Every structure is written in structure tokens, then in C-alpha cells.
């Protein structure tokens, strides 16, 4: 199957290139047009139906007209001269709020409308909420409907913001905006320029790495071009699959997929390029098309194994209960499978067309490069494996020490969001009112005895909630039209996005609800703090299930690939150390050094899957090469030295490219994105340079042939291959010879 695909691609390269060009452009355009219809920004929507906050959301939708795609924001209106609001000012604020509610906000504007652009035009829901006790400001609630991550929806909010500012400024009033869309848009604006610069820098770094390694402009540009085409097709396939299957993606998934595809796609092209150059060097009489066919057939199996390892790792997310995790698995799997098909077709086709011109103007096809760091590293690992093992474990252990005292952060604070105008407005509100006034915790009561609800019937529950330590205020009870449901808004003194508010809701508030629930009723607690309190429970449950299932599945794959019981154990232990070190380092940086409330709740699972899957890829490459070298005559340690010498350049280059790709996320606008980017980049670097180039070969040198127990490699007869003497180290190859099957 693999050789059939690569064979056709190298026999008919122009057909394959044309097909991918059309397919990539079409699917990329489709994905960009529909991506925001396939994403769900509400984290609560990903909770299983049996969680308390999810039940509260259903009551809010059924009895109080709440909409799942509604985006509430808060507008602060105050006098521009800093004086307290007068009664006339309050009347004017309320009158302008009514006018804003009647005035439609148009987006896109008629002059800016593009074909297939989605119309976000709507009338906002604007209502007065409360005046500060010192009359320093009055708050309005604003509700706009749509996906807050959609640029069109963000432009709609910007248009409303300008309308509101202009309307109140005419009367000498200033405005501030916070919560919901205000937070999202301000954070996006704060990080927009930086994200663009970082993206450009990432591409430049990848290009420079390729130029330095291959001394060729084509070898630098063509991989990026190929990966961009395949990545566009993959993104469109993911969005299309999500829409057809009726599942919602998390807004961060498309961005994460793009980074993953750039990283692994260039990695796969690198594996082909290294072997292609080696093939052309060793057989100068062979045509470029024939060399491409031979290389793609051999390396294609290694690429397939690497891709299927990632797919298998992320497929374990199917057992997760939290929907954000459960949909991430299929999305990554579909994207990686598309990249795999492209790696077996488009990439070999490009090699076949480019031939020896791929490495112009480099003289690398004629001159053998001098052995450098890789050869010295291989010799050092072979001569002093115990020292290398101790040093590697000490480094990983020191980083893993950061796990002590690590906490999970289930909020949405941090990053640029804490330095925006929305954050400043929230701080101003919190100085005069409970922090939860703009994002209350809702207690929803439904009658189950066939009767109706009254404020008097719920008076005991409201009093109990008022008495809870940490509750700043309890709003009057609101009844549904048919009086079968009621809502009691609770305003915590802590920011609903903070751990204190989540602890309050999951503990004292729910305890008070359970103890004072009126007979014949059912009570659920909802709101931001309640949602993230429930997410914490779901994530804790999923981590206990997904971790062992993923580890077992990857171990099974290694058993099949390496044909050994001991080698997979060695590789998985090393990868486990790498994961612990990476997560510990992330806690040291974000929680302890930067003072964040903890590491993002998605980080351990996403990091585990990426570090284990991608780290296993590199370990497969070095492990397979060690086995190949041990089949030759000579000492086991000499075989390890040769394996490191030949494979380290490919692993190092691939690791740097992948780390640069993920590292671009580390300076993104969101705290969660920053943490995933930093941690994954660090984990990949540790996997490449500490695990695959140092620790695993050193362990293999210590264990010798017994590492392949119970099926040691069949050693060829003949004299031992001598290790290169120092004076001779100028004629050996540094190429990674990936042996497969």
C-alpha cells in the first residue's frame, strides 16, 4: 500500500502535484469560510449532561430564554469629569441604553461585504443593571449573539462599542467595556501585531534551519510550500468532518492543528530529504526520479509508523467525558492522516520533479561533510553511557521537581487579558461592587411537584445563600412566565474566573443549596464559576483514564515495531521522565516564576499526548537505527555510536523545527495558548536532545543486545566494523539512515 502510493507519486509527479494544488486550495478556502460555524466557544457546552452546571444551562434556556451563543458584556458609564452621577445622568444613561437596543448594528458593512461573508447584523439587548453605591458609575448589560472567536462577530462588537462611546460622549459621559466579547476582542487586539510578527519569525527560523542544513534554497522553500498545501487541505477536512458529524470544535483547535501540521509535516519532509540526499550521494548515476521512488518507499514506512503513533495517542481521547478533549482527538487524527497521505504522495512527487536540483547550489552531493557534533556525541555516549544516563536523569529530575505544589487553573485569566482596557474596567467595577456582579452565579430552581413557585416559597433558600461567606450580594428572585422555574443570581466577592470563586461555588454555595432546597423542587447552580468547577471534576476524571490508556496503546505499538519487550519499556520510561520534566518546568515558569494561579487545566493532557507521541517518534528512529547497527558485526557500544552519528542530525533538525513551530504559540494572546506553546516546545527539545540522542542510546549501550530481549537482532557474520579513528573522521556520513522493514 505504502509503496504503491509512493510509486505512483514518483511515476506521475505532475498529476499528483496538480491534484494536491486544486484539492489544497479548495479545502483551505472551505475551511476558512466555515471554521467558525464548526466551533463552540462556550466551555460549558462541552460538559456531560449530568453535570450540575450543564443542567442549570438547560433550565436557563428552557425557562428564561438564554441562548447558548449569547455573549454578555458589561458597559460601565461614568461622568467624564469624575463627579458622581446625578439623577438626571442616570435617566440619560437609561434612555441612551434604550436607544442602543433599538438601533441595529450592521456587520459586515455594505461597502465591505464579500461573497459568502456571514451576516452578523443584529439588534443588541441592552439593559440597565445597577448603580455603584458611591454613584461613581452605572452598569449596563449588553448581549450580542454569535461565536466570539469569529472575526466578523468581533467586528460587530467593535461597531457597537463605537456607537455606545459616541452616544454617551455627547452628554459628557465616558464608557468602559468588560466581560465576554469585550475581554475576547481586547485580548485579540493586544496580541494581533505580536502574533503576526511571531508567525513571520517562525517561518524565517524554519527557512534558515533548512538553508543551514542543506545549503539550498529549494530545500528550504519547497517543504514549507508542500506543508502549506497539505495543511490547508487538512484544515478543510477537519472542519468539513466536524460539520458533517454534527460536532463542535473548541476555538483553539484550528490554531493548534495548524501548528501541529507545520511541525510534523516539515519533520516528515526532513526525513525524506536527508535520505534523498544520501541516496543521490551514494548513487551518482541514479536519476532523481528513481532515487525519489527508492527513498519514499523505504522512509514512507517510518513516516507511516510515526503518524499512526500520533493518531493512536490522540484516539484515546475518545474515552474522555469532557467534550473539549473528546473532539480534539478526532480532529488531530483527521489532520495527521491527511498529512500522512500528503507525505506519501505530494512530497515524493516534489522530490521526483526537483531531482538533484533540490540541493542546488550546494556541493553536498559531491562532497562528504565532515563528522562533527553528532559523531562526537555518539562516541561519548558509547564510551561513558552511565555518566550520560546519570546526567540526563538528574536534569530531568530537577525539572520534574516543579510538579511539587503544582495547581490547575480552570479560569480564563492571564496573558494579555490582564493588561487590557477590559481588565481595567473590571478592576474599576470590583472596587465598588462585588467582583461577580458582571458575571453572576445563577441558582436555578424548578418545580417537580406540579405546583408553582413564589418568592416566599424560595425565601429560605435565598436567605441561606445570603449568609454564605464569600457571597457579596443576592439578587431578588426572578420567576419564569409560567412560575414553574425561578432564578436567584448570586454575586461572589471573588472574580468568577478565579479559583476562590470556583471553590466557593463547588463548596459552600452548593452545600447551602442542598441543605435548603425547598420540598418538591430541583435546584442547579450555573454560571462561569460553576462551569469551571465542574470542568475541573471532569478533567480530573479524564486524566486518570486517558493517561494509562494512551501509554498502554503506544507501548503496544512499540512492541510491534521494535519486536522486543525490554526496549519499549526503556523508551516509555524515558518518555515518562521527559513528560514529568516538561510539566514540572512549566509549573516552575508559569505558576512560581510568573505568579499565575496555576497551569492551564488542558496542559497536562495535551502535553502528555504531544510529548509522548512526538517523543516516541524520535525514539522509534533512534531505536530502529540502533537495532540495524547491532545486526552488523562488532561490539554493541560501537553500534550505538554509529546509530547516534547517523541519526542525530535528522532528529536534531526535526526537533528544532517542531519546537520553533510550537514555540510561536508561547507568545500568543491567551494564557492557555502560551503555556501549551512553551511546554510543548520544551518537551520536544527534551525529547530530541536529551532522550533520543543521549538517554536512550546510553541505556542501549549499557544493556547491549539484551535490550532487544527476547528477539535480539540477527548478527551478520564477518569482521567487526572498526570505529573511525580521530584522523579519519572526515569521510563518514552524517545522514540518518532510517531502516524500516
Predicted regions and their residues:
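Short hinge/gating elements
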Residues: 41-44, 412-413
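Structured non-transmembrane domains adjacent to transmembrane bundles in polytopic membrane proteins
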Residues: 49-71, 80-181, 405-592, 596-598, ...
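Membrane-embedded transmembrane helical bundles of large multi-pass transporters/channels
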Residues: 1-40, 125, 145-408, 518-520, ...
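Short, conserved active-site loops that position catalytic residues or coordinate cofactors/metal ions
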Residues: 36-40, 71-77
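N-terminal extramembrane/targeting module of integral membrane proteins
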Residues: 75, 79-82, 383, 397, ...
Amino acid at each position: 500500500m505504502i509503496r504503491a502510493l509512493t510509486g505512483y507519486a514518483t511515476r506521475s509527479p505532475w498529476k499528483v502535484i496538480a491534484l494536491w494544488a486544486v484539492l489544497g486550495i479548495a479545502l483551505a478556502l472551505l475551511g476558512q469560510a466555515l471554521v467558525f460555524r464548526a466551533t463552540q466557544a462556550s466551555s460549558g457546552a462541552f460538559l456531560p449532561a449530568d453535570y450540575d452546571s450543564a443542567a442549570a444551562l438547560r433550565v436557563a434556556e428552557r425557562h428564561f430564554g438564554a441562548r447558548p451563543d449569547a455573549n454578555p458584556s458589561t458597559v460601565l458609564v461614568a461622568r467624564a469629569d469624575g463627579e458622581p452621577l446625578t439623577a438626571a445622568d442616570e435617566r440619560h444613561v437609561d434612555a441612551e441604553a434604550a436607544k442602543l437596543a433599538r438601533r441595529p448594528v450592521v456587520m459586515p458593512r455594505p461597502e465591505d461585504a464579500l461573497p459568502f461573508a456571514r451576516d452578523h447584523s443584529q439588534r443588541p439587548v441592552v439593559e440597565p443593571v445597577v448603580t455603584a453605591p458611591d454613584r461613581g458609575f452605572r452598569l449596563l448589560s449588553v448581549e450580542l449573539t454569535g461565536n466570539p472567536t469569529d472575526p466578523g462577530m468581533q467586528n460587530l462588537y467593535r461597531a457597537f462599542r463605537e456607537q455606545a462611546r459616541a452616544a454617551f460622549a455627547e452628554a459628557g459621559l465616558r464608557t468602559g467595556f468588560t466581560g465576554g466579547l469585550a475581554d475576547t476582542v481586547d485580548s485579540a487586539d493586544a496580541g494581533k501585531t505580536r502574533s503576526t510578527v511571531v508567525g513571520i519569525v517562525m517561518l524565517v527560523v524554519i527557512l534558515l534551519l533548512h538553508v543551514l542544513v542543506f545549503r539550498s534554497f529549494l530545500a528550504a522553500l519547497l517543504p514549507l510550500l508542500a506543508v502549506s498545501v497539505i495543511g490547508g487541505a487538512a484544515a478543510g477536512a477537519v472542519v468539513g468532518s466536524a460539520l458533517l458529524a454534527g460536532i463542535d470544535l473548541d476555538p483553539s483547535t484550528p490554531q493548534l492543528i495548524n501548528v501541529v501540521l507545520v511541525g510534523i509535516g516539515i519533520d516528515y519532509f526532513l526525513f525524506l530529504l536527508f535520505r534523498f540526499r544520501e541516496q543521490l550521494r551514494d548513487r551518482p548515476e541514479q536519476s532523481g526520479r528513481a532515487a525519489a521512488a527508492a527513498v519514499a518507499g523505504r522512509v514512507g514506512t517510518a513516516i507511516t509508523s510515526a503518524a499512526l503513533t500520533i493518531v493512536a495517542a490522540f484516539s484515546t481521547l475518545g474515552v474522555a467525558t469532557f467534550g473539549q478533549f473528546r473532539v480534539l482527538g478526532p480532529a488531530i487524527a483527521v489532520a495527521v492522516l491527511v498529512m500522512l497521505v500528503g507525505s506519501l504522495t505530494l512530497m515524493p512527487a516534489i522530490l521526483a520533479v526537483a531531482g538533484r536540483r533540490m540541493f542546488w547550489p550546494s556541493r553536498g552531493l559531491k562532497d562528504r561533510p565532515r563528522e562533527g557534533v553528532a559523531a562526537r556525541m555518539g562516541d561519548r555516549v558509547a564510551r561513558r553511557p552511565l555518566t550520560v544516563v546519570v546526567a540526563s536523569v538528574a536534569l530531568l529530575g530537577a525539572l520534574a521537581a516543579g510538579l511539587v505544589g503544582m495547581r490547575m487553573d480552570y479560569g480564563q485569566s492571564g496573558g494579555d487579558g490582564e493588561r487590557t482596557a477590559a481588565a481595567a474596567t473590571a478592576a474599576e467595577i470590583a472596587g465598588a461592587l462585588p467582583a461577580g456582579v458582571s458575571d453572576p452565579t445563577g441558582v436555578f430552581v424548578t418545580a417537580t411537584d406540579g405546583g408553582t413557585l413564589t418568592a416566599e416559597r424560595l425565601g429560605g433558600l435565598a436567605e441561606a445563600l445570603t449568609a454564605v461567606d464569600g457571597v457579596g450580594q443576592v439578587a431578588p428572585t426572578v420567576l419564569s412566565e409560567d412560575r414553574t422555574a425561578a432564578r436567584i443570581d448570586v454575586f461572589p466577592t471573588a472574580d468568577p474566573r478565579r479559583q476562590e470563586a470556583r471553590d466557593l461555588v463547588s463548596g459552600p454555595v452548593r452545600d447551602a443549596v442542598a441543605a435548603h432546597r425547598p420540598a418538591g423542587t430541583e435546584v442547579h447552580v450555573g454560571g462561569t464559576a460553576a462551569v469551571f468547577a465542574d470542568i475541573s471534576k471532569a478533567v480530573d476524571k479524564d486524566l486518570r483514564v486517558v493517561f494509562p490508556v494512551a501509554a498502554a496503546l503506544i507501548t503496544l505499538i512499540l512492541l510491534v515495531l521494535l519486536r522486543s519487550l525490554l526496549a519499549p519499556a526503556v523508551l516509555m520510561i524515558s518518555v515518562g521522565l521527559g513528560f514529568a520534566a516538561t510539566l514540572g518546568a512549566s509549573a516552575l515558569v508559569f505558576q512560581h516564576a510568573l505568579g499565575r494561579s496555576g497551569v492551564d487545566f488542558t496542559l497536562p493532557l495535551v502535553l502528555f499526548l504531544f510529548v509522548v507521541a512526538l517523543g516516541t517518534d524520535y525514539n522509534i528512529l533512534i531505536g530502529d537505527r540502533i537495532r540495524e547497527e547491532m545486526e552488523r558485526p562488532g561490539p554493541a557500544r560501537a553500534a550505538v555510536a554509529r546509530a547516534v552519528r547517523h541519526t542525530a542530525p535528522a532528529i536534531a533538525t526535526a526537533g528544532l523545527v517542531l519546537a520553533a513551530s510550537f514555540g510561536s504559540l508561547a507568545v500568543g494572546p491567551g494564557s492557555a495558548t502560551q503555556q501549551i506553546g512553551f511546554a510543548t516546545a520544551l518537551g520536544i527539545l527534551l525529547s530530541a536532545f536529551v532522550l533520543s540522542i543521549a538517554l536512550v542510546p546510553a541505556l542501549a549501550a549499557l544493556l547491549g543486545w539484551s535490550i532487544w530481549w527476547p528477539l535480539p537482532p540477527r548478527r551478520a557474520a564477518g569482521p567487526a566494523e572498526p570505529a573511525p579513528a580521530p584522523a579519519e573522521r572526515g569521510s563518514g556520513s552524517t545522514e540518518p539512515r532510517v531502516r524500516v522493514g
